[in-house]
């Protein structure tokens, strides 16, 4: 009953209006798992390769029909008769079929959609939520699931490559902490979100939104933005903190960081972060430095890791081998997890296990090109107490993730 009987792929569209791939896995008992590959705007140089058609005459070369064909002609025949419960075996086969370190032959977009669809089909066969399948992969067999609410990180002001404004830092987030439930966290976040919108209108700023649903006003500097965000948080500062995704590789060139009209060297950049941490209630900074500058990451980790979460995204790309190196060399103290960065459920689970064992905080994350797929909500719930970074409280493909956690909370509490 658990055997794979059919694998079907199709080209659909993501929240940025570009094609992506959706995969359906059907079992011999008629159960179906359906998953969609997300897509990033700012990508780590070592992350798994999204396979695009490259035909400029069609969809600016960003079609994914080659990835769809790879599912139908290469992956599907190899998976026929396999059990959807054999996640590790199937993911290993997908990696073997591709044969490259970055999944560039079949495409990480094809592979991740298949891998997630298998996990969802398994959940359907078992009659359990997807988060239970993820929990079983994360823990020893027989361990009971204990619900611990994720902590939302909501990207309320967009900058960098996610918005058409002057802000170098890509994401300014609010993070409700210390709440007893995810619902309480979201209610607190919603209050701040609407106060921020009111302040933007009051100051004559645009309330248009960026790729991830956050406001994208034309603010002039990091300090102006943090000041505005602090004003919106107001009396809630004990329970609502600020988190940043600098995505610093996007404003780094020739050894300098171009931010707020200045060119800073790495020491000045670290001092910049230290200063704003002292001034504002910042609890987390993601990708604060250039992704290939491991030595400077070590310096910043030693200097600031007792004050904030230093989150590795582009530097780690959810790759267990790279995360292992980071842990060994003292780089960062938190790991951002994006399933499509590494390409399979099994490798993602391994990365989370490594991070947790080393005492690193785990942040489950969306991408800028998202869809209605809810897998990351289930992964965040499975991790127990992890951060969930899924965008803002506008754009349905973002809010859907938070709403799914609210539904799951009702099931487990």
From Swiss-Prot:
GO terms for biological process: glycolytic process. Its EC number is 4.2.1.11. Gene3D superfamilies: Enolase-like C-terminal domain, Enolase-like, N-terminal domain. One of its GO terms (cellular component) is phosphopyruvate hydratase complex. PANTHER family: ENOLASE. Mg(2+) binds at residues 245, 286, 313. The active site is at 212 (proton donor), 338 (proton acceptor). Keywords: Cytoplasm, Glycolysis, Lyase, Magnesium, Metal-binding, Secreted. GO terms for molecular function: magnesium ion binding; phosphopyruvate hydratase activity. Pfam families: Enolase_C (PF00113), Enolase_N (PF03952). The keyword Transferase does not apply. Pathway: Carbohydrate degradation; glycolysis; pyruvate from D-glyceraldehyde 3-phosphate: step 4/5. Its cofactor is Mg(2+). It comes from Neorickettsia sennetsu (strain ATCC VR-367 / Miyayama) (Ehrlichia sennetsu). It comes from the Bacteria. This is Enolase.
